[in-house]
Amino acid sequence: MKLFNICLVIFTTLLSPTLLSAEINSGDTAWILTATALVLFMTLPGLALFYGGLVRNQNILSVLMQCFAICCIVSVIWVIYGYSLAFTGAGSIIGGTDALFLSSLMRESASGTLPESLFVVFQMTFAVITPALVVGAFAERMKFSAMCIFTVLWVTLVYLPACHMVWGGGYLGSIGVIDFAGGLVVHATCGIGALVAAMMLGPRKGFPGGSLVPHNRPMAVSYTHLTLPTKRIV
């Protein structure tokens, strides 16, 4: 229902007569709409299936709920202050507060050749999938409540500054750093975060020597087939 409401807002905005201007490119808009859906699809059900298939049977629901919870938590963060800190303001490390609660978002707002509302949701999908990728590093070893706290802190202290510095007009962007597909903002940040989390938590109970066989390999492999079209966006 939440995803449906977001999509409804986007399409209502796109159909507004005020957007029928030279600034908005219909081809760019259609493609970014498609890319937005595909990136979200990589997280739910993509990553949920992948990590769920690799853990033991007794932990599958825990991993699935972590992926779903991250999607919900980051979506709320993005609307309240995430987009504002990532894409507004002239700070070199972090953005400003001009768009808290998306207060600056108008029906006629544009970001390049796209409606700004679409740009907000597109960038939100990357903010969602990045901490979700870290789940694999602490699977079966972190409580749900701890994961929620970790997600809020990690997105706020790591992802948002990195996003602003590269994509939001911050320091790295000003010195010529280019990241078209998220190699730095997404993959580098979540990779380092996953490494630190794994080192802090240590190995799973029973490793080595215990039975840690994935409970459903076909379920994990299905993620690869489901997301092959998605990889085309990069």
Language-model features: locations:
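Hydrophobic alpha-helical transmembrane bundles of multi-pass membrane proteins
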Residues: 3-12, 16-226
